[in-house]
Structures are given as C-alpha cells and as structure tokens.
C-alpha cells in the first residue's frame, strides 16, 4: 500500500513528546551517578539516543504518513519501541533510587518523574491513535464513543504507571525484592502489549469502524488490569502493610469492573437480539459513498422507492 504524504505537524509533535521524555530520563540517569562513572553514563545515554533517533527518523515519518488512513501498523511499532527503551531507562532509575540511602534522594524529583510519565505515556498513545485525523469517522456520536473507549485505555495506562510509581516514590518500600520485581515487569509487559491491542483493533476495523464491536481490549483490560490491580493492591495492604497504595485507583478499578461487566452483558444481549437485516445494513458503506443515481425502474413492475437513509441505519450509525 502506497502511503500518502506525512502529516508534518503530527510527526513533529510525536517526535517532540518522545525525545523530550527520553531527554528527561537521561538527565535523571546522569544526575544519579557521581565522579568518573557520571561521564561513562553520559556517553552511554548519548550513543543510545543517537541510535534511537536514527530509527525514530524513519518510523515517525511512516506513522505520520498512515495517520490519515485506517491503518495503525507503524504506530504499534513506534509504541513498542518507545516503551521498550523508556522502561529500560526507568528500571535503572528505580534501582538507583533503591540503592540510595533513605532520604538521600529528593522526593520532589521522584514526584516529577511520575508526573512526566503520567503525561507523556498516555499522551503519546492518544497521538498515535490520532482520532481527530480520522476523516472517515463522520458522525459525532461514533467519534465520541470511540473517544470514550480510548479514554479507558489512557486510564489503564495511568493505573499501571501508578503501580510502578509506588516502587520509587516512597523513600523506602515495605515490599520484598521479589514482589518489587514482579510488579515492575508485570506493568512493563502490560504497557507494551495492551496499547498495541487497542491500536490493532482500530486498524482491523478499517474505515467502517464500529466502536461497539471493539471488545478484545475491554476483555483483556478487565482481566489483566482491573482484577489483578485490585488483588495486588489488596495484598500489599493486607500482607505487607503498604500505606502507599492508591485508594483512588482501587476505586477506579472497582468502578471499571462494574462498568465493563454491564457492557459485556449489554453486548451479549445486543448480539443475541440483533436482527440480521439490520446487521447487514450496518455493514454497508455510508450513503454518501454510494451511487447517487438510482437504477431505472423495470418495465413491468412496481415503482422503485427513492433511496434515502433508513431509520435503522440512523439508529445503528453510532
């Protein structure tokens, strides 16, 4: 498939978010080391950033070229590459904070690191989806329904980042070593995979996107984020007496469990009661893409009714 010319604003904004967050992470890594080791770390991160920038120079242009299409394949590649490198740097920052003496590290710097991740990671995901560039999503109701589903993805990303932030924000955590490693790499894996699942659902739907049919991500999110996060936070409070557990995100997970359960029940009812003619009508292209000239009526037969939007089509075009 030949891609259209890239959207320069989208390419510049995506590159700015990625390289800006990477530069701040590099500053944390360099600042955490002293003496001759600081020079070595500085050289390593500079070489890594140059290699990453060479790859980003091509992938970001491909992402900007496909942003006006219904495909998001290059967006998934860029997301995977970004999170893979970002989390490696974050792991070393976390280990440096853990090795520091109690109270030696600035708590404001730890909060600033969490704030940076909370803005850049969900923000980059929404940039890669580029809902405002989807010109084929014409109806306001369908666009807002899709925006609401993407907002749930952003909330899940914030939930995972909050679980990771509980490892480095307090000066000293009460979790054992195996629990810290399990928590970090579990969130790492979900940050890599779940947004790619959401992007693949958007890509597979094509131009005739139907948000009510995008059920793979809600199922995975319900099992891997909402259920596991509630159990993990409850175990931290009950077993390890961890007072840093976010009660707000526990409430978010409970609300998400109830909301998604209702969504699944409603979806099953709609699939069971959906009439086949209405389903076929929903899969047809919009009236604006059809031939506006009606076919000539037969010589011997009833007159052909004029073409126009049907009530069923209006009800299903959400």
Swiss-Prot record:
The keyword Transit peptide does not apply. InterPro entries: CECR6/TMEM121, TMEM121. Keywords: Membrane, Transmembrane, Transmembrane helix. It is found in: Membrane. The chain crosses the membrane at residues 10-30, 43-63, 74-94, 112-132, 174-194, 214-234. One of its GO terms (cellular component) is membrane. It is a multi-pass membrane protein. Residues 278-309 have a biased composition (Pro residues). It comes from the Eukaryota. Residues 278-318 are annotated as: Disordered. The keyword Transmembrane helix applies. Belongs to the TMEM121 family. May play a role in MAPK signaling. This is Transmembrane protein 121. It comes from Mus musculus. The lineage of its organism: Eukaryota, Metazoa, Chordata, Craniata, Vertebrata. The gene is Tmem121.
């Amino acid at each position: 498939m030949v891609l259209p010319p890239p959207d320069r604003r989208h390419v510049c904004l995506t590159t700015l978010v990625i390289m800006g967050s990477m530069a701040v992470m590099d500053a944390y890594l360099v600042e955490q080391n002293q003496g001759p080791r600081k020079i070595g770390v500085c050289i390593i991160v500079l070489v890594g950033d140059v290699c990453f920038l060479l790859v980003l120079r091509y992938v970001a242009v491909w992402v900007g070229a496909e942003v006006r299409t219904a495909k998001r394949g290059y967006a998934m590649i860029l997301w995977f590459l970004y999170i893979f490198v970002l989390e490696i740097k974050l792991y070393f920052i976390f280990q440096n904070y853990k090795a520091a003496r109690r109270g030696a590290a600035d708590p404001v710097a730890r909060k600033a690191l969490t704030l940076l991740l909370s803005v850049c990671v969900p923000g980059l995901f929404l940039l890669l989806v580029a809902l405002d560039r989807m010109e084929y999503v014409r109806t306001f109701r369908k666009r807002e329904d899709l925006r609401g589903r993407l907002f749930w993805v952003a909330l899940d990303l914030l939930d995972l980042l909050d679980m990771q932030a509980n490892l480095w924000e307090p000066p000293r955590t009460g979790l054992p070593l195996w629990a810290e490693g399990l928590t970090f790499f579990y969130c790492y894996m979900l940050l890599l995979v779940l947004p790619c699942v959401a992007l693949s659902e958007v890509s597979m739907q094509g131009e005739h996107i139907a948000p009510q049919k995008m059920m793979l991500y809600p199922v995975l999110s319900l099992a891997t984020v909402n259920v596991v996060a509630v159990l993990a936070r409850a175990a931290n409070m009950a077993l390890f007496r961890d007072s840093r557990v976010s009660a707000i995100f526990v409430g978010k997970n409970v609300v998400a469990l109830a909301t998604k359960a209702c969504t699944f029940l409603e979806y099953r009812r709609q699939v069971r009661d959906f009439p086949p003619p209405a389903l076929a009508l929903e899969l047809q292209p919009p009236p604006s893409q059809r031939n506006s000239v009606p076919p000539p009526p037969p010589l011997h037969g009833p007159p052909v009714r004029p073409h126009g939007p049907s009530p069923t089509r209006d009800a299903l075009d959400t």
